[in-house]
């Protein structure tokens, strides 16, 4: 629930798509008579709803998914994974929904240690939601940009080809490093663009499980 979820240029923000996917997964769990819970995080765990069964519990989760607003702007996936590991003692199926942009300066994921511990206890899958337009910068001249999480801002000359290429290379590197990490720990992952049919992405994820 960090501020980066608000980004969106294709008619729907990442927040909208994340909320819809979370709701679909919750409905599916209730239909299968499974318990369902939710953990909301930014750079800290914002709210934890313990797993339960029942329609009223489902509606409570859906309401929180739609209405919840974080108290801070950052992202710390490690915090969420550590909390999950400690809060749920029995093995469970868990879905991590995020843009997965939580990296070191070299682009490597910051959450490897927490992931390694979590997957030893739980069946974890990753659903990455992204906006394709976020991964490239159009040539539109001098632009003032602001990081939605850190609050830092700067003027950027988007006509600089080297800068645009470096930006795209950075995103590509982040994606490759995260994919290697998930393969290393046998974590199923699907990437869903905000302008794609997320149902197809979810079907692909479940077919591969």
What are these regions (language model features)?
Residues 57-92, 104-106, 131-132:
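Von Willebrand factor
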Residues 21, 57, 61, 80, ...:
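Internal, well-ordered alpha-helical segments in soluble enzyme and binding-protein domains
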């Amino acid at each position: 629930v960090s501020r980066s979820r608000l980004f969106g240029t294709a008619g729907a923000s990442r927040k909208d798509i994340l909320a819809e996917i979370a709701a679909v997964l919750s409905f599916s769990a209730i239909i299968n008579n499974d318990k369902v819970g939710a953990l909301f995080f930014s750079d800290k765990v914002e709210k934890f709803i313990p797993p339960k069964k029942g329609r009223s519990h489902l509606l409570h989760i859906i309401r929180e998914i739609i209405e919840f607003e974080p108290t801070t702007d950052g992202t710390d996936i490690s915090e969420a994974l550590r909390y999950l590991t400690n809060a749920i003692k029995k093995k469970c199926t868990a879905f991590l929904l995020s843009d997965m942009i939580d990296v070191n300066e070299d682009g490597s994921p910051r959450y490897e240690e927490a992931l390694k511990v979590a997957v030893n206890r739980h069946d974890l899958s990753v659903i990455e939601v992204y906006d394709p337009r976020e991964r490239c910068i159009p040539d539109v001249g001098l632009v003032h940009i602001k990081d939605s999480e850190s609050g830092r801002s700067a003027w950027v000359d988007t006509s600089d080809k080297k800068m645009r290429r470096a930006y795209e290379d950075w995103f590509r590197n982040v994606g490759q490093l995260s994919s290697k990490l998930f393969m290393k720990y046998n974590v199923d992952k699907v990437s869903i663009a905000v302008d794609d049919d997320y149902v197809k992405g979810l079907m692909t994820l479940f077919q591969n499980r």
